[in-house]
Amino acid sequence: MKSWVYRILEKEKILSQKNKYSIGILGLAYKENTNSVKNSPTLNLLRKLKNNKITIYDPEAKLKKKIKNCNQINNINFLLKISNVIIVMTPWNEFKKVSKILEKHKKKNIILIDPYRIININIVKNKYIKYFTIGKK
């Protein structure tokens, strides 16, 4: 899954335009309902995104040490407001409300990468949001 996310970022040329995109990552824990980051796919992805500005939100897990290009925040609304690339890395139940928050902010030109299909595609499916999930084009 983590390599799939990275391939989408490469395909959309997000990695090569480091100042154009603000990347928001939803989920740091290795799975939902835990605060453990051991074997977290997010940490592997962060190592590959060291040239990009990253904001992370997780309701339970915290970064154990500071990572140069990363800022962990405790407000999902703020992350969604400042990010134009949003990646779901842990399928927390709380993230199901992301589509409604994005709709409320009326955000445009968003790239939403959701390997777990936790986001309600019927709400986010519009001309302003480019939605990627495993198994759907």
Feature names for model-found ranges:
Residues 1-137:
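Structural/interface elements that position substrates and couple domains in central-metabolism enzymes
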